[in-house]
Amino acid sequence: MHDQGGLLPGFSHIMPPYWYKYGEEMSHQEFGLYAANKLEERILELGAENIAAFIGEPIQGAGGVIIPPDNYWPRIQEICKKYDILLVVDEVICGFGRTGNWFGSDTYNIKPDIITMAKGISSGYIPLSGIMVGSRVSDVMINEGGEFYHGYTYSGHPVALSLIHI
């Protein structure tokens, strides 16, 4: 997927759940498990203690709208729980009804620890983004984190901020 050059150092990748490119010799279900199990292989290779999170899009937009087999994401979530690794889902493209559910995560019946979102919040008309965190993350932030200083690309845009009061 990332053949155009190196990405940030220290990040590891697994194969995308792209059946048409990598799995035509298998059924969708066989390939879904095969692709998801690549995460467990990578965890065992690197050591779970060296992995903070698994990050992915429910449906990969930048890869050409790669729709994974139905069993891919549930298996990814199972592996993340087994090794106590955060599951972060990028819903910038899939969120807000684009898969027929509110989020792509809902389509695959998974419960991520963190969801990133944008675009669909305002249909792309206003620069607005956000994150949602589950109790696994929020409890630590509230109970142990102290002040949470942050700044984002869209911070302080007056039109976007006015939407909060609607």
What is each stretch, according to the model?
Residues 1-164:
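Conserved N-terminal phosphate-binding loop of PLP-dependent enzymes in the Aspartate aminotransferase
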